[in-house]
Amino acid sequence: MTRKILVTSALPYANGPIHLGHLVEYIQTDIWARFQRLRGHDCHYVCADDAHGTPIMLKARERGITPEALIAEVGEEHQRDFADFLIEFDNYHTTHSDENRYFAELIYSRLNQAGHIDRKVIKQAYDPKLEMFLPDRYIKGECPRCGAEDQYGDSCEACGATYTPAELKNAVSVVSGERPVERESEHYFFRLQDFEAMLREWASPEHLQAEVANKLAEWFKEGLRSWDISRDAPYFGFRIPDTEDKYFYVWLDAPIGYMASFKHLCERKGLDFDDWWGPDSTAELYHFIGKDIIYFHALFWPAMLHGAGFRKPTEICAHGFLTVNGQKMSKSRGTFIMARTWLDHLNPEYLRYYFAAKLSASVHDLDLSLDDFTQRVNADLVGKLVNIASRCAGFIHKRFEGRLGETLDDPALYRQFTAAGEHIAELYEKREFSRAMREIMALADQANQYVDEQKPWVLAKQEDQADRVQDICTQGLNLFRVLVVYLKPVLPRLAADAEAFLNLPEQCWADAKTPLLDHGIRKFKPLMTRVDPDRVQAMLEDSKKTLQPKGEPQAAEAGPLTSDPIAEQIEIGDFAKVDLRIARIEQAEHVEGADKLLRLQLDLGGETRQVFAGIKQAYRPEDLEGRLTVMAANLKPRKMKFGVSEGMVLAAGPGGSDLYLLEPHQGAQPGMRVK
């Protein structure tokens, strides 16, 4: 039965280029959508640029252009990069569109009429020079708790404290350098708590991965709160109906971009929008997203849709983050790789295959190990897959005028290959791509083993074995064709080249069941070359250059004491007041809604403490668990908006990704005092 499937990826923000971290999601989604089409389903894949918000407005101002000009320029770059990575959208749009304005206003109006929108006055930081309210990230100053300088307006990267911009000492606007003042403003809030019963029922394994469903259970336990959906002028976005200076917050109209892009497709293709988005739609709707935006997609988005009379998603498909060589992407190491830099040096299908070989249906992070990448692509795609065709095609072309035989040498082996198709299809369907790639490469091993055992190059020297040679090579090329069909969602360009070589029209999944017999093929040309390690290294070097700041060469960086001099002297008794203890990190996890914090559960040797640490940009939670560190154990517990922090872990470094937790030497035990 043909299914109706609509697939989306999260919208890339329109103020910068696409990098490999972004591509994890778009490649994953594209593979899944291509697979559905290959199976004969009516599948549409839409996306758009997320084109609103303060960062876009300020970047355009900095460059002396309009926001519209900036998003148009970035949008063209995004679409070029996606096209060159063979991401096949049915429609790519922008949230700065008539369709998006229409749906944003419609959804807001329906929610407002139903009583799900509140208004209340809040206090915010205001830049008197630019005459604009400032998001927390655009305010910096000294932490009111530990005194660390150059901290953002919502939390301290040094000690993990959270606070309001008004509490920040010596605060300045990052944009103008002026000291912000506090002003009141009326904001609009979406009453998420009105939909708790519906969300609890919807948030099941049918719609969410188990890890995500468990996370939602935690949020339900904490209680759902109203969500601020408005921003004050000046702001680049859509004005809220019946207001003079209030705009929809970017996170309200961003997911609505899925609807807007599909509406744009409907207008181009003559599709019925309500068949896909109406409350009684039988179509399937899948959102592929990163695990950092689950709150928006698994709570706010289905609540907005339900409250406005639209259907809810069939499934939210979350994935983890990308690391390179086991570490966060790094500009200094050249591993913060832009899509265009990769394309300048390497085949995009190399990366598509490697990501597929590592992706599963879980939210675990994915590591791009460049040594493993080189070895795996060369072994699997060149040494196994393409090798089958190159070993057999020459005999068919030279000895049999490019014509396959009328029979297979081993029909049972061919049936084994085609029978594997349903299991491989199940793995694709479940987004278990890594398992699918292993199954396909196991078949490729069998195909190569078959050719090795039959030795057509030996038989070709015997005149009475000509028919057998033709049948063996016909068998090998048919096995190759089956594998290409199975890999077509991952390697669309190689598949198209293979179809041309085999003199075939575009293949679908079902075509693999029928062998090619008594069929003319074209002369074989190499379908893929080996990854050259020198080109990988050149790409890394280019990444370093691409990300270097422009302008005059900078003087050598001063040492830490220059920018952060030693504090005033204290008495030994002052230091003795701080009780430093060894602690083992039992558990570490992201804090939803916090850009810089991790929640740590620390074992003090008989007592467990919860600490919020501003180290999210420097460490992955799974890398911390089980490690020893040092904590200040006698600090008064501090109530934060995410919970109570019962101490502080110690780290060195200026902040951000350059933070280094203190670790004791071997032999130290949890609870030991640091003297």
Curated annotation (Swiss-Prot):
Where does the motif 'HIGH' region lie? 12-22
Compartments annotated for it: namely: Cytoplasm
In this chain, ATP is annotated as bound at: 331
Question: What keywords would UniProt list here?
Answer: Aminoacyl-tRNA synthetase, ATP-binding, Cytoplasm, Ligase, Metal-binding, Nucleotide-binding, Protein biosynthesis, RNA-binding, tRNA-binding, Zinc
One Gene Ontology term, aspect cellular component: cytosol
Any one of the GO BP annotations: methionyl-tRNA aminoacylation
Hydrolase: is it a keyword of this entry?
Answer: no
The cofactor named in the record is: Zn(2+)
Which superkingdom heads the taxonomic lineage of this protein's source? Bacteria
User: Which Pfam families does the record associate with it?
Assistant: Anticodon_3, tRNA-synt_1g, tRNA_bind
Which residues belong to the signal peptide in this entry? none
Q: Catalysed reaction per UniProt?
A: tRNA(Met) + L-methionine + ATP = L-methionyl-tRNA(Met) + AMP + diphosphate
In which residues does the motif 'KMSKS' region occur?
328-332
Q: What region holds the tRNA-binding domain?
A: 574-675
Q: What is its EC number?
A: 6.1.1.10
Quote the subunit structure annotation: Homodimer.
Report the PANTHER family cross-referenced here: METHIONINE--TRNA LIGASE (PTHR45765), METHIONINE--TRNA LIGASE, CYTOPLASMIC (PTHR45765:SF1)
Report the sequence similarity comment from the record: Belongs to the class-I aminoacyl-tRNA synthetase family. MetG type 1 subfamily.
Function recorded in the entry = Is required not only for elongation of protein synthesis but also for the initiation of all mRNA translation through initiator tRNA(fMet) aminoacylation.
Q: What is this protein called?
A: Methionine--tRNA ligase
Organism for this UniProt entry:
Alkalilimnicola ehrlichii (strain ATCC BAA-1101 / DSM 17681 / MLHE-1)
